[in-house]
């Protein structure tokens, strides 16, 4: 909610016009002439007068006592009426800083009786109070002069993000940076030399078709333009340029994209926002207001006084502002429900859109720029919100621009001014009343039953313009946007605007509270506390993850202590120390790896952070520090669990001092790891890149830690990297703590090593320090790394921006582009013309069976949310649908309408069989036969509200893929392709055929383009019954009209189509044949025909006593929703659901349901010989085809994979340079073993980690496609694995060539092929392992935790840390159950297992290499064929589990 008060330090400081948009009670400000009794006490007989006067005197005394308080205390005290035990209303003193929820609720009930009616009066009371004492309200006038914005794009096929293009584009960018190659990017102009004035106290509507530049204009005015765009021109606020104030705090930009933490409730999100944005100058205002009222003897209304004082108190965890915003945005009903996300059930899309609006309204900004705030909202809700905005603008003198896609006529009438934007040019800017006159000036007229807003968005379109030509005596000629724009300057409104520009704004008139000069709304300490509280809340909501991590490290410590049991751990010799080395290294790995989950959490929270950072909610350090500080206790707990369980059971040095030193070392390592992963997450910014960078960093850190390869064996040119590795300091600290203990002080008899004791020999053999003070140096170094990584984390948050963008790409070039556009235009014109009243265009009708759908007494329940139980709501189930009945018939277009939260999508999900949880009751029949979901999926289509598509394929490929799998086998390829082309033409997708779909809000298609693709994907399936959930949501009026014409054409072919729809215009609403209207609570209140011009609908509701008549020209859809709101029901004491159930219309509806629930004579139930439209092999082929193109165009995944492969190969080659040529002593063999271990484990782990985010994105698409009956899970699994194997094969080839040559292995064909084979199969099973875990867990965060747990086990039992013969007998079986152990067996044995050389072993002497491998490690060369076969078995096992997981597990909650 906007601030009610001004923004400056000036005590007179000015009332900001934006208080809550909530209403007040019917009494307001009370002047000196009224007493408190006049406000609250009813008039009574004289017999009670004396006692009432005593009460009044008491009230006056208490108010006087408040006025005598010091200013600081006085502004925190208020008086609120309370009902006493005897039923009397009494004023009670109350501390406004400690308002309980019941107090806020009580005040809300007094101020807000009916929001729709009382809001204006409430705002006037607030304004009157400040006007009465002469406090001036600040105003902001925004001017933009000659603004042009342009951006760079790549042209033609080079814009597609294939691996080849990304490589080429990267090389070009590097060469271009050094001016060695001219840039091949093209400039596109988004805004073209536009100028205008946005005035306070006038609400401005911004209209324009998609890609017209609306969002760019709003972002430019708000000072939030993308850094990659170039802007010229001048923008001023009250004559001041951006450098003179802080635009992000002076104004508020409300984005199209709904980014919120799904773990927080609606109220918590708004409270946090209000807390960070601050109160502006409300406190100074209240101080001055209170002083002036005291001087003039004015006693304010206690309710108004309490409200204004409460919202003026800074630093509150929760504010009344939140309660008011919840009320006026209609979010009070879901205030305590989680926002939700992709995998977590939460509020609806419309409610989330309102939450995005509310998040900025709770702040004190004086100018508001709102970008498409009505997406997903019904027309009634949009109207109410815009009405509140209008009251705010007019009463409080706020500056406001609102961009809307499909404003209904009544909503359009609320605006004062219009800015019409098209092709980056302003066609019209000025009063709404003159806009039709302007177009009549050009010869165009708006039809009678056409919304003006719809007309304005279509009249500039070449495809739609001609139908509005009104000068019949003159031939029509297309009037271009440039012609309109230039003609506006000669129109009287344009001339007036030009004359206003000639007079510069007088800076001296700028109110001191108008422009904000402080960067943040509250103090640094308050910002830190707010972020700290939120971080603690998020940790509690994600407690499962932290509990899971704790359980994981507990289990792992129990396993470790049984592997390295102290009875098996001997002390005193060098060979005994080797086993302790393995135990300490593994412990270090686990404590460090347990912090890997921090990387996923960081990436997950970045989108919300970037939004709030750019809006100046808080500085980056305030976001980063709580995440660091709150993890310190967790580090202590995890380190304590590990040390407590393993230290003495393994048999480390027994003294208490060394125990606590070891605990300190592990704690520091864990803190360093958490800090490192947070930093890497902020650097990577996406799951794939972060996982790649994270795994690569771990590889370097671990390899150079001193255990895998000794320091003395590292080449001199890599020594610096050894000292840069944090792992080295952790490893040094723990091994020094152990081996400098007295029990390792046996004298050393090996003269080749200059050391006095066995402990020093163990340290020096691997290059560790032996001086005791190095332990503390290492501790300080680890803490220093932790501080450094946290500092880098803050810097990354401060300076890096999110990856990905939504810029357009030029798909065609030159003449080809023009031809393509012409073809698309001509086809569309033909379609639009042919879909007129002369008769529908049926086009190519593929064979299908017309089907009806009837349902009755449908009830749907979900388990009661814990948040609602916490609020005192009783019951175990929450009912969302209540006795819903209806029928959908072939050739009949049915609208499913209701306010947000009425249950429209819920009903559609139930009918379509898309619900994955909850409890369903009732009957559903298809053409008289009980619905069978398997066959129903074959004959139905479902256009979901959320446009879910594979992001890395093109539009054409998406449609071909859908048609390929869903059309029957008797339709040949040519017919199928022609049908796809026709559908693309119907939905106007031909110009976008080669565009990448992309991720919503990140890249690729815009919202409206994505919506049209969703519809086309279902239409190409040729379904008999089509469900469309909000098909026009997010579309402008013209795009919505195109979509609805497509829908109408579909219905005219005899199909059954039902659409939920939020905000239909008159012509769209009246294109429907029948209506099913629902009210909040999931009850039907109308089901029947609309009639001509909605006559039957209007007659039905007007016949209800008390319902106001519809006005001429009013949208029947909006009127219908307005008169059936809960507040109207309450006012008229009606229940529309009860009225409907007692009506003749209900009885006719029941008769229809009964008829359609009975099979017609001679009919047969829908039956298919096979479950799926295509055969198993075709499904596999089609899925592989899509996955092939998806992977080819996913450079973030595959380009990074190959880059990391090359970098890791080269680095390992340098670290282990020619290590394979030396097998003279035990350390040489350990180094080679370490090289093979690192080469397999780390790149394999990288594959397993990076594949999971890619699988997570595709899994969401898989859920939709599986529900649509496109394919079985097995072909999908096989195809995805096949594509991965293809890339793994190439990856292994690159890696093997680099590594094999640099580490110095023998160049024989057999050994090279064995090396390649084991590397390839290991990379495949690692990748499949990551895919398998993704299929078995709800999200990739949990999958990542599970992966780190099992990788730790694989690491422990790989045979490197503890050879198989030394593993206790009770754990030896798990060695054979560890894939990495088999790979190391194969690699080591194939490379050196056939050598006859001798190896020197300390304390033993020379021994034959084959004997050493057999007795020391359990390796035999003759066992290689078995090892090779087992690798295939691992691959098949993981493939089977992956397929099983995606087939039987569904983590989507609907």
Swiss-Prot record:
GO cellular component, one term: plasma membrane
Region (Disordered) residue spans: 812-838
GO biological process: response to reactive oxygen species; xenobiotic transport
Transmembrane domains' residue ranges: 544-564, 584-604, 623-643, 663-683, 689-709, 716-736, 775-795, 1199-1219, 1231-1251, 1285-1303, 1312-1332, 1342-1362, 1367-1387, 1423-1443
Disulfide pairings: none
Biased composition regions of type Basic and acidic residues, renumbered to the chain: 812-824
Binding annotation for ATP 1: 208-215
GO molecular function term, any single one: ATP hydrolysis activity
Family: Belongs to the ABC transporter superfamily. ABCG family. PDR (TC 3.A.1.205) subfamily.
Protein name (database record): ABC transporter G family member 39
Source organism of this protein record: Arabidopsis thaliana
Gene: ABCG39
